[in-house]
Design a protein with these regions (language model features):
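Short, Lys/Arg-rich, polar N-terminal cytosolic tail immediately upstream
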Residues: 1-7
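Transmembrane helix-loop-helix hairpins at the membrane interface
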Residues: 128-225
Length: 225
């Protein structure tokens, strides 16, 4: 029992460290955004640091993820061939994501739910440095977040390939994803959690992280259009 607890705590710490590495990288872009108008040359240096560290971090994530799968892979994660049927499933799941967001917008417009607390800050940051913030949100954030909240998460927890672990893992992955996007227990967290659950289902359905990354990419791209 003690061994299992220590094993679980070790995985929690590792996931936190991986998340901290990603947040540190995104913080560099926040600094660049904050100095974009007051010190443009400094902002460009931080953009360079963001891109270089993102490249290194991405290489680390890919290496560690593959190493995990080589050591233990009871769910047989790997590469699933891209076929018309798989594209159709991804697009159907994307429509489900849009439906969740449409429902959420209706609840906000009708003053049933409050708007996200961070919405104003996100819009202000985008206006300060639109190209780099949008590029990061669309291309880099989906990759890092899918590795953390889906790839590494399911390599650390709920590893057994059985229905109970699958559905509980989808729920917990979604809740962690939702909480990390709001840092609060709120209706907004449940909204993000629903999106996270759909992405987790996509990852487990295809057993290929490229599909959940593609879905996350489509979602973030739609958000800026």
């Amino acid at each position: 029992m003690t061994h299992k607890v220590l094993h679980w705590l070790k995985h929690v710490v590792l996931l936190i460290l991986l998340l901290a590495a990603y947040l540190t990288n995104s913080f560099l872009l926040e600094v660049a955004t904050a100095t974009a108008h007051s010190a443009p040359s400094l902002a460009m240096r931080f953009i360079g640091l963001t891109l270089m560290s993102a490249a290194g971090l991405l290489a680390l994530f890919i290496w560690y993820y593959r190493r995990q799968l080589q050591a233990e892979n009871p769910r047989n994660f790997g590469k699933t061939p891209v076929r018309f049927n798989s594209i159709l499933i991804v697009m159907t799941t994307f429509i489900a994501l849009l439906a969740v967001q449409f429902l959420w917008m209706l609840l906000i417009v009708n003053h049933i739910l409050p708007p996200p607390d961070n919405q104003a800050a996100v819009e202000a940051a985008t206006n300060q440095l639109p190209f780099w913030n949008n590029a990061y949100d669309v291309f880099l954030a989906p990759i890092f977040e899918e590795f953390i909240f889906r790839g590494f998460f399911f390599n650390f927890f709920f590893v057994k390939n059985r229905p109970r672990d699958t559905w509980l893992g989808i729920l917990m992955s979604g809740l962690v994803f939702g909480y990390m996007h709001t840092l609060s227990l709120s209706p907004t967290m449940l909204f993000y959690s629903a999106l996270g659950c759909l992405m987790a289902w996509t990852y487990l359905h295809f057993k290929d992280i490229r599909y959940s990354i593609a879905l996350h990419f489509l979602n973030n791209l739609w958000a800026i259009l």
